[in-house]
Regions:
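C-terminal motif of bacterial Sec signal peptides marking the signal peptidase cleavage site
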Residues: 4-7
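Extracytoplasmic cell-surface/polysaccharide-interacting catalytic and binding patches
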Residues: 9-12, 16-17, 22-25, 29-141, ...
Length: 275
């Protein structure tokens, strides 16, 4: 955001209207006052995005650990995981819970896992969606490093040219954080003409996709990879992929038009780890 400080100077000019009153003889010659030289306005300067939310302290002088050894703190909902920044293969969140305790069976498989704060918020959001007559499904949630390796290898076989854009490399998937959900919609087959491809950019045209784009932030969820995010996330547009970041952050991202990786890129003083 550019803040331009401009100095405004008002000038008033007076004119004497002719009347029938005799003009008095001039007295002392008025002193001519020199016009002040206008002060140059300050050059516009970029103002950094405000750090509205606490981030884990990062010492610029500290030796950064390799990403393959990184384990986010338990209270860190904003850990950056992308094409560049990964996680320890053995990292498993400590508060994973079964979604079957929070969601109806028609929405998801009961043994799917998510971190407890995300699961609680998801339960409230899905309840609201069902009350609005929608039929969301949760197709994917927490994925371990090994699970992501299996998924990625499958895409390497099915679509090797685009596999890295479709599926994150193991250790570089937000799903390993345990705060991410992939949604489905019963309207997808009618839009894509396929019953075997549950994920599609056309999800944003479904009733569920439109509802999430409008309301997910109210429950603390934010779309991780919106259009144009591939430069930072490494992934193509994924309108079905939502990450729990907390209500305050999700509200800020929604209002500002930013996505999480973009926000972190603006405010982090140093890299979170060595790629």
């Amino acid at each position: 955001m550019l803040i331009i400080l401009a100095a405004c100077q008002s000038q008033a000019a007076s004119a004497l209207s002719p009347t029938n009153t005799p003009t008095p003889n001039p007295t002392t010659q008025p002193t001519v006052t020199s016009t002040p030289t206008p002060t140059a306005s300050p050059s516009p300067s970029a103002t950094p995005a405000p750090t509205l939310f606490p981030l884990p302290a990062l010492d610029p002088q500290a030796t950064l650990a390799p990403c393959e050894k990184r384990r986010p703190a338990a209270d860190d909902l904003l850990a950056e995981v992308s094409d560049n920044y990964g996680l320890d293969p053995n990292y498993v969140p400590g508060d994973l819970v079964k979604l079957g305790n929070y969601l109806p069976g028609r929405v998801t498989l009961p043994d799917m896992l998510l971190r407890q704060p995300a699961a609680q918020a998801l339960g409230k959001m899905v309840k609201a969606m069902l009350a609005d007559g929608l039929a969301p499904t949760v197709l994917s949630s927490y994925r371990s490093y090994f699970d992501q390796a299996v998924a990625h290898n499958r895409w390497l076989v099915e679509d090797p040219a685009n596999a890295n854009e479709i599926s994150a490399l193991p250790g570089h998937s937000e799903h390993q954080l345990g705060t991410v959900v992939d949604f489905g919609s019963p309207e997808i087959p009618g839009l894509t003409g396929s019953t075997t491809a549950p994920f599609s950019p056309l999800f944003d045209q479904t009733s569920e996709g439109r509802w999430l784009a409008k309301h997910a932030f109210e429950y603390g969820f934010s779309m991780s990879s919106p259009p144009g995010a591939q430069l930072l996330t490494g992934l193509a547009y994924e309108p079905w992929h939502y990450r729990y970041v907390g209500v305050e952050m999700a509200t800020y991202l929604h209002a500002s038009g930013l996505y999480l990786d973009q926000y972190l890129f603006k405010v982090r003083p140093v890299m979170p780890c060595l790629p």
